[in-house]
Amino acid sequence: MGDGMKALITGASSGIGRDMARYLSNQGYDLILVARRKTRLQELKKELKTNIEIINIDISSTFNCMDLYKTVKDEDIDVLINCAGFGIYGNFNDTSLDKELDLIDTNIKAVHTLTKLFLKDFVKKDEGYILNVSSSAGFMSGPLMSSYYASKGYVLKLTEAISYELKKECSNVY
């Protein structure tokens, strides 16, 4: 299925990102795995069957997102999967503002930046796939994880809006 195709996965060192890497490698995709935890990426690379490139970078920095894009833009990527993210637990009034701003940088700004950069390339060649991993939290709100709920709502609404725009243009980017 994915023979000859290449996917870039952020947050690939654990959770959904790691599982997506395993699944896509089994489907024949070559992968670029991106995360902060290099050791975990190296361990994952050993178990995968296809060509794997590891990029150890913290995408909470917009500069690092731009640098990541510049590093891989000529590699003919077919699929972008934005999985990097984290949550903060506690009453909004009690949680750390610094941690919340880090959450916004990772869960929102990195997704927004990478989607914008790769989408331009995908639209230009009229093919490509972007999967922005949100959460059921994106559909609701609740106590003790207000920043996480809000960040996943942003990802959901951004992705839906882009999808509508692409559909209206009869684009082959999904």
Give the residues covered by each predicted segment:
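Conserved glycine-rich cofactor-binding loop
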Residues: 13-14
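Conserved glycine-rich Rossmann-like NAD(P)H-binding loop of the short-chain dehydrogenase/reductase
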Residues: 27-43
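Rossmann-fold cofactor-recognition segment
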Residues: 48-63
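Conserved NAD(P)H cofactor-binding loop of Rossmann-fold oxidoreductase domains
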Residues: 83-88
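Substrate-binding pocket helix/loop in short-chain dehydrogenase/reductase
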Residues: 91-92, 99-104
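Active-site helix of classical SDR
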Residues: 115, 151
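Residue(s) in the substrate-gating loop at a strand-loop-helix junction
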Residues: 135
